[in-house]
């Protein structure tokens, strides 16, 4: 487990880092990623539903970000390139991005955190360039409402009849009710792990082509 190191000073971009809620919940064969759409500048809310903080790289990977939008987009583009270099190796791609983030003088100035999900893996890449795997419960959250969202999701994870999406939506509702820098306008991405039968069918289809 990696300890996050707080900064003693805070640039506008770094301050933005906490002004949102991004939550990922994994249960069974499903992983869900939610992000609110509120935009803040410093301590001022400038838009309540205009910013999509989730991005689907391809059919297999989705990313949520907290922080400066421009910085996050730069990092997501870098990660997309790494995923292209290391297909089906999400952890390897994330680690390679983290190495570059730590060593490149320009990248070191970028202020953002990412949650990256595939059907098989969930990772957090923090503002220090660390790659962090979630606890055994598969729940990850970042942003100012992240602590509330994570706590709520953990309380709901074992409730009978609650699938990953229902848990995530309920936890997100609780978090955004508490956190003034997050709101009830969300984007949602869902990925499902393919069964062996589905993978076999797809492989057969490709072979026949």
UniProtKB/Swiss-Prot annotation:
NCBIfam families found in the cross-reference section: ATP_dep_HslV, PRK05456.1
GO biological process: mitochondrial DNA replication; proteolysis involved in protein catabolic process; rolling circle DNA replication
Catalysed conversion reaction: ATP-dependent cleavage of peptide bonds with broad specificity
Subcellular location: Mitochondrion matrix, Kinetoplast
Gene name tied to this protein: HslV
Name of the molecule in the record: ATP-dependent protease subunit HslV
GO cellular component entries: ciliary plasm; cytoplasm; HslUV protease complex; kinetoplast; mitochondrial nucleoid; mitochondrion; nuclear lumen; proteasome core complex
Entry similarity comment: Belongs to the peptidase T1B family. HslV subfamily.
Pfam families cross-referenced by the UniProt entry: Proteasome (PF00227)
Recorded superkingdom: Eukaryota
Known EC number: 3.4.25.2
Subcellular location, principal: mitochondrion
Substitution effect: residue 20 to A: Strongly impairs peptidase activity
Molecular-function GO term, any one: threonine-type endopeptidase activity
Role description: Protease subunit of a proteasome-like degradation complex. HslU recognizes protein substrates and unfolds these before guiding them to HslV for hydrolysis. HslV is not believed to degrade folded proteins. The HslVU protease complex functions in mitochondrial DNA replication by regulating DNA helicase PIF2 protein levels.
Entry keywords, A to Z: Hydrolase, Kinetoplast, Mitochondrion, Protease, Threonine protease, Transit peptide
Transit peptide location: 1-19
Top EC category: hydrolase
Residues annotated as catalytic: 20
UniProt-listed InterPro entries: ATP-dep_Prtase_HsIV_su, Ntn_hydrolases_N, Proteasome_sua/b, Proteasome_suB-type
Subunit-structure text: A double ring-shaped homohexamer of HslV is capped on each side by a ring-shaped HslU homohexamer. The assembly of the HslU/HslV complex (HslVU) is dependent on binding of ATP.
